[in-house]
Amino acid sequence: MQTTVPSSVLDIYRMLPEGTRCEVLYNQLSMSPSPSTEHQLISFKLSGLLFVFLEKSNKGIAFAAPTDVYFEVEQSVVQPDLLVILDENKAIIQKDGIYGAPDVIFEILSANRKHDTLKKKTLYEKAGVKEYFIIDPSDNSVAMFAFNGSKQYEMIYEEKGRILSDILGCDLNF
């Protein structure tokens, strides 16, 4: 019997069983535990709000974790908590995942805060994600990062329980 030896971290990732909570960040595998109940509640509420908004506005489509997002930049595959792809960018949606930068990404902080606030923020910035929202489930605070005319993310606002998106043109309270 002939076996295939993986030649990259991405090959190893693709061999993992479906549903494995794992990402490839900067060509390194990163496992994560199941999210907290607070995390899940926020994700559920926000995904419902986004779904209703996008259905009414016909602007795009939302996906929830676990949806693989493949970035050529930094050889990374991530599973954001929520993401939105506008209609004009739907070509990046493939059967097995998203290949390229979603227009908007939402990450709900977990125990490993550095993962979302530093590593993923840097990756999303390099990949060209237009808006990045970081939600802290401990107090429902939302920090929104965008390019704002520059090549680097700037914090646009920080507020509790409110999503203001210029890209989507929405104001959602959760």
Question: Where would I find each of the regions flagged by the language model?
Answer:
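Gly/Pro/Ser/Thr-rich low-complexity, intrinsically disordered segments predominantly at protein N-termini
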Residues: 1-174
